[in-house]
Amino acid sequence: IPEASPVACGTRKRVPEKKTRDILSASGKWEVTKEKARVTFPRVTELAGAIQTSDNVQAGFIWDSTAKQFGLKSIPLRELKNSTSTISANITTATKNPTWALRFARYLAAPEKGSPLFEKHHFTPIQGDTWVLEPEIVFYCGGVNREAVAVALKRFQEREGCLIKTQFAGCGTIVGSIQSGQFNMPDLFMTCDVSYMAMVQPEFTQPSDVSSTRVCMLVRKGNPKNIQTLNDLARAGIGIGTTDPQMSTLGALSHAMFEDLDIKQSIQENKSIIVTSPTAHELILQMEGHDKLDVALVYEANCQHLESNVEIIDIHHPLAVATQNIATARQSKFPHMMTRLKQEVLSTQSHDSFINHGFQWEGPDTGQ
């Protein structure tokens, strides 16, 4: 702005001046700008009106949307290039009806509803969620998380007024479904292990870690076969159970450890693997219901409610840990709702649920 041009600002309590002050202070130009301000106004619209009608004020710092509403000429400044501000609808903690409050907030931002009205008044709309009164969310989730994540899903459904259609399965099965085409794409995917998110990462936003659990060996009470390490599984006469390595993260990690320790060939020659189940839950049922299995490789998180006729043997191997993460599908019609669902899964209440179900917490610090 030339030195001869009078300048006006909104009052210091108003957002435009604070935004202007913060940005111009970074470039060392705020003080000289403030000194040239002849007058301040309590509201941005009053400032815009003064620029439009007054001979004493020829320029001012206002929102570009306000300038367009008053038919004023905007002069883009390099210093203000990143001076955008987001209008948000915020649900109060005191509300007695959060579901309808959230619906109204979604309505305001929906491209089919409120968004065109904001654009009509010269605001730049965000890409809001598709408007549906009761959205149906498709959530693919690794089976190991089923019980731990249930609390978060129930709470979210009740608050948001949506329906979450869950598909729990081995991550090999889930990834195969995702890779088969867009008609099998979920809105949100939570893995059994981060390695499976990596297989489909281009289809998803940046994932967030949630939890982790270790692979362990489940043996008979008293450990009659004296199984102490994975290397002991190479001995003849030991009946081994794993989950399917093609369908399950747990099975893939188990067989990867066999290969890394160079015992896979011995296990195959001894025909030791006599049970291969789709899920750890089914494998544990086999272990508890029949005596043909001497050892089963499962997650620690699967072992919270076991009968007393089995024991857990720890596995000390770098591959004996699975980390669960979560991400939103890029093509989801409800990206903002998915952000809130992720926040629910990463909340303090969810932290407690995962810990109670035998997981280690890998999400944000909850102060617990």
What are these model-predicted stretches?
Residues 1-167, 172-186, 191-213, 219-368:
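Exported/periplasmic ABC-transporter solute-binding proteins
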